[in-house]
Amino acid sequence: MKKFYLYILFCLVLIPSPSFAMKNDVLVSSETKYYKTIYESDSNVFVLSNVVDKTIEISEQEYNDVYDDVKVMESNSNQTSYKKIAISIYKSGNDFKYEVNLEWKKIPKVRSNDIIAIGFDNKNIKANGNYSFIQNFCTSDGCKSNNSYSLRTFSTGSSATFSLPTSSLTYLNQIFSFTVVKKITEKIISQTISGDYSHATSKININNALKHSVDVDSGIKLYNSISSYYDSIPVTKTTWTGSW
């Protein structure tokens, strides 16, 4: 057991820094939330089409106390996943950078096309590009990264849709970020952004997974035709106040 946990620690050391922040980026606002999602099937056999999920916010202590983080969620009719989501605002030169970071405490059983997103108030700002996405994961062969994703942009936010690795994993996290600029000449004294994540609990192809929008209050807004394919967590918000 001791060797096992030493191996996990070794893998974590090899994982790239969990942020897209550059040397000159300054963190000015952030919020971290911890969630537990319980998946229940209405039969003794776990059938993907009849899964009901319930998500509740938990404390950092409860999240950290889940010691069996390297196990895939159980294959019986009741499963529990734990997620940590962090949403951050960075001062980046004359502009700002938004970032959302999702970390899994337990590796999800279903691996399909998931969605990570950032919503923002578009009254005074607009996205300026510089989109970045990375998925960090560890297997028995070591730790790797993948930056393959499909981008969706809206006036009120942006999202990255991506496929989860299908191999046996011991660690998994995703990071998405982009920069924003002012679209007014007047001074801006506050910015509010939100981070959100939708995990596919059923197999769904990429074309259908892209059927969503993003805004600051609702986070990821799935079209009705695909809403039953995903679980959900509450939107996590952070607000910066100052002078820009």
Language-model-detected regions and their locations in the chain:
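N-terminal propeptides/leader regions of secreted preproproteins
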Residues: 22-84, 88
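Intrinsic low-complexity, intrinsically disordered segments enriched in polar/basic residues
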Residues: 2-6, 30-37, 239
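Serine/threonine-rich low-complexity intrinsically disordered regions
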Residues: 1-2, 59, 205
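Homeobox/homeodomain signature
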Residues: 4-5, 9-10, 48, 230, ...
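Mature secreted bioactive peptide module from preproproteins
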Residues: 71-244
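N-terminal cationic amphipathic segment used for targeting or macromolecule association
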Residues: 17-19, 33, 158
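Sec-dependent N-terminal signal peptides of Gram-positive bacterial secreted proteins and lipoproteins
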Residues: 1-23
